[in-house]
Every structure is written in C-alpha cells, then in structure tokens.
Amino acid sequence: MDGVKEWFNSIPPVSRYMFAIFLGIPVLAAMHLISFNYLYLDFTFTFKHFHLWRLITAPCIISSLGPMFLFNLIFFYQYTTRLESLNYAGKSDDYLFCIIFISICNIIFGLIFEYYFLGTMTIMSLIYIYSRMNPTGTSNFYGFFSFKTIYLPWVFLVAHFLQTGHPPYSDFLAIVSGHIFFYLTDIYPRANGVPALIKTPKFITNIFNKGDRNPNNVRRDPRTGRPIQEGGYNWGQGHALG
C-alpha cells in the first residue's frame, strides 16, 4: 500500500488529480454511488437547469469500466505525466491552463455535434500537443512499430478508425482543439517573434506555490531549455506529448 501511495504522490500535481478523476468517476459509477446521467454534457441540463458541474465532469469521462477504458487510461497517464514532467516541468499552472483551454474547445465541439463524454477528446488533444512539442522524438504504438512522435495523433486516428469502423470525427476535432492552443502559444508567437496570444490567468498561477518555480521569472523553450524573450510579458505556455 505504501508503494501505491508513493507512486501516486510521485505523479506531477495536475496529472495526479486528473488521473484520480478519470479513474474515480467510472469506479464510483460501477459501485452505483454516482450516475453518468448527472455527469455527461448536455446543453439543456447544463445551461437551462444550471448543472454547471457537467462542464467539469464531461471532459474527464472516458467510458464505463472495461478494456477500452483501461487502454485509454494508460494512454492518458503516459502522455499527461510526460507533458507535465518534461515540457511543463515547474509550470504546472501553465499545464492546468492548457487542459482548461482544450477542454473549453472540446466542450464547444461537444455541444455542437452532441458528444456527451469528452474524456477521449481530452486525451487526443494532449497527445497532439505532446507530438508538436516533441516532434523529433520516437514513439511506438502498442510496441508493434516505431515512428516520429510528430505522427503520433494521426496513428491514433487511424487505429481508432480500424477498431471501430467509424470515421473518428471526435478525435479529429480534439486534434483541432489541441492545434488551436499550440498555434496561439507556440506557432504564431515563434513565427512572428511576439509573446503568446493567450496566457495563464493569475488566479490559476496563485493556486500553485511558485516560490521555487523560476526565481528570475524566465520562460524557457521546452525543446532547448533556453530563455525566450517575450517583450516584457510573462505568458503561460502550452505544449504537446511525445
């Protein structure tokens, strides 16, 4: 039991609580302590009956317990911990903002196209961001073959199509959500030499103890570790999985 506690506490903070929520919801549902009926995304319940908690729970629901849930949970654990411990090392506030931003985008898509459970979209968005932040790395799929990490989300896209036989529209929209975030925080600023177009709100930064994060408040390129000149602004940053 001590080993499990030690392992759980070793997970970076945002990933730790997200993992607990992703796992806890279907476990509690299987024990009949909660019902998915009160957690999925629905416009009428959310905005007309003010079930605003659905905006938080829907992006964290993969499915009920089962083999596919387990596979998706493993993928989530792999890529969220890599992102937060590598690309967002010491910047858990920026990582939390990244998750909030992509969740908002996925919620908008979910409301438009009537997707009720958005957990797999959250995972796909993070996988896309990871692939863009670590494009030259090497990834493998189920241990069968290796490829450049930049292709990772597209490999998942094809795999989901082969598994289900249905066009993976929600996966593609999740990639769009991830790309919007990466474009605003990396592609456009890097191409034009300007600060990121969105930044982590102060209230999110205040959640975390920032005393030892960065004494000089210098933002660094996750690929090189070198300081990034930001024209006097302290912008939050979003990055991808590998």
Swiss-Prot record:
Keyword entries, A-Z: Endoplasmic reticulum, Membrane, Transmembrane, Transmembrane helix, Unfolded protein response
Regions annotated as coiled coil: none
Residues exposed to the Lumenal side: 40-98, 162-167
GO terms of molecular function: signal recognition particle binding
Residue ranges crossing the lipid bilayer per the database entry: 19-39, 99-119, 141-161, 168-188
GO biological process terms held by the UniProt record: endoplasmic reticulum unfolded protein response; ERAD pathway
Regions of compositional bias (Gly residues) in chain numbering: 233-242
Membrane-topology descriptor: Multi-pass membrane protein
Region (Disordered) residue spans: 214-242
Subcellular location: Endoplasmic reticulum membrane
Compositional bias per record (Basic and acidic residues), positions renumbered to this chain: 214-224
This protein's GO CC annotations: endoplasmic reticulum membrane
Segments on the Cytoplasmic face: 1-18, 120-140, 189-242
SUPFAM superfamilies found in the cross-reference section: Rhomboid-like
Protein family according to the UniProt entry: Belongs to the derlin family.
Function: May be involved in the degradation process of specific misfolded endoplasmic reticulum (ER) luminal proteins. May also involved in endoplasmic reticulum stress-induced pre-emptive quality control, a mechanism that selectively attenuates the translocation of newly synthesized proteins into the endoplasmic reticulum and reroutes them to the cytosol for proteasomal degradation.
Protein name per UniProt: Probable derlin-1 homolog
Organism: Dictyostelium discoideum
Gene designation: derl1
